[in-house]
A protein has these predicted regions:
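Cysteine-nucleophile amide-bond enzymes
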Residues: 1-181
């Protein structure tokens, strides 16, 4: 995989054909389903929010066996740095494993991307969406989500404010999108 094509500030989306619970909720760019995303920092590093570890900086090469979509936005060097600095301010936050809005010191992957780009204009940079837990194929909320939220004494937050890598991959702010080969 040619990681040399990545530029600072690129949003990197990951496909995992074996993941069903997140990927089954919608379809993203190119008809693919993305279960994860992060921001490329340069020098082979990615900032991302991952289960069990929260917001971390890691090597993008760990995804070399996955299909990767690169989404690029034409921004000034200053704005790209502002996005990266903001993202780095979230290092150490816990993972928002319930995907609920406004969780103190917790973020999930696409929420991290939204928050980092928010810093450019101090307002939503990407289109806002609501959470959808209906499976595309089954048109019902799967038992996985019902049981997950019930375990924490919550209702499934269908329709609450939130984001998803698939919806984000379709945002019209991206000027250039390509699969990394």
């Amino acid at each position: 995989m040619n990681f040399q094509k990545l530029r600072k500030g690129d949003v990197v989306f990951i496909v995992d054909d074996n993941e069903e619970n997140i990927s089954s909720l919608s379809v993203g760019y190119g008809g693919l389903s993305y279960y994860h995303c992060g921001i490329y920092l340069g020098d082979g590093k990615l900032i991302e929010a991952v289960k069990y570890h929260g917001v971390i900086e890691d090597d993008v090469s760990k995804y070399s066996i996955k299909k990767i979509l690169v989404a690029r936005i034409k921004l000034t060097v200053e704005d790209i740095q502002k996005v990266i600095d903001t993202a780095k301010n979230f290092l150490g936050y816990d993972y928002n494993d319930l995907f609920l809005p406004n969780q103190l010191n917790k973020l999930y992957c696409s929420e991290l991307v939204h928050q980092a780009f928010f810093s450019i204009e101090n307002q939503d940079f990407f289109t806002s969406h609501t959470l959808n837990y209906f499976s595309v194929a089954k048109n019902t909320i799967s038992d996985f989500w019902i049981q997950l939220y019930a375990k924490h004494s919550y209702e499934v937050p269908q329709g609450e404010n939130g984001s998803h890598p698939n919806n984000l991959s379709l945002d019209n702010k991206f000027d250039q999108l390509f699969i990394l080969l």
